[in-house]
Amino acid sequence: MIYIDINQEKIPALGLGTFNLKGEACRDSVADAISIGYRHIDTAKMYENEEAVGQGIKDASIDRDNLFVTTKIWHTDLSRSGITEGLADSLHKLQTDYVNLALIHWPSENMDLRECLDTLMELQQQGKTQLIGVSNFPAALLQEARSLAPVICNQVEYHPYLDQSAVLNVLGEHNMMLTAYCPIAKGEVLQDEQLIVLGEKYGKSPTQITLRWLVQQENVAA
């Protein structure tokens, strides 16, 4: 497993995203992923699967300290009480006392960014989350967030067909990481002739080549 070192924390560079996984299929996918070596599981309140994720982790019988769990606060909960209660609910469903990383899932026009980040920092101090971050923040808003709190991550859509250089530049300035979602562009890479040719040359699939392209970049996870 490749790890990214951020703020003296070792974060697995490859994780299992659980968007669109529900119920028994989600539980089994999480348990199976852990059994073959995955150590980063990503979920969110909006996915409506935290309970199944928690059961999958329990079924895997892994030491909690050996697993990195990320969840996200939905944009309708971006208030002090919403974030506090939302994370408490997530922890209950996940059957854990803490997550490793809590993210603001999407920015909201009506959010008080300082209050949101202050609340996340308080929850961090209470041990409810080890690290804090954001998701789907454009470069300018990411810069503002970093000026207010020690956010370590921005989770955004990133793949060979979507340029995220502006976001990457901000992340690089502050030694933050990018976590890529939709890393294989919803399957588009599977039909990419250039990637198919490269795969034949190196004995790899287009998916493997794409994931390698992502994680070989500095402080990029997928």
Spans of model-derived segments:
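Beta/alpha (TIM)-barrel catalytic core signal, keyed to glycine-rich beta->alpha loops juxtaposed to Asp/Glu
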Residues: 107-222
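N-terminal binding-site loop/beta-alpha segment at the start of enzyme catalytic domains
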Residues: 1-67
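Short, well-ordered coil/turn segments that N-cap beta-strands
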Residues: 9-14, 37-40, 62-67, 96-100, ...
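Acidic (Asp/Glu)-rich catalytic clusters
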Residues: 5-6, 34, 54-66, 88-97, ...
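Glycine/small-residue-rich loop that forms an oxyanion/phosphate-binding "nest" at active or ligand-binding sites
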Residues: 72-121
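Acidic-and-aromatic substrate-binding clefts and catalytic sites of carbohydrate-active enzymes
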Residues: 21-24, 44-52, 76-81, 109-112, ...
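Short, acidic/polar
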Residues: 21-34, 79-94, 115, 138-143, ...
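Conserved, mostly hydrophobic/aromatic
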Residues: 16, 33, 41, 53, ...
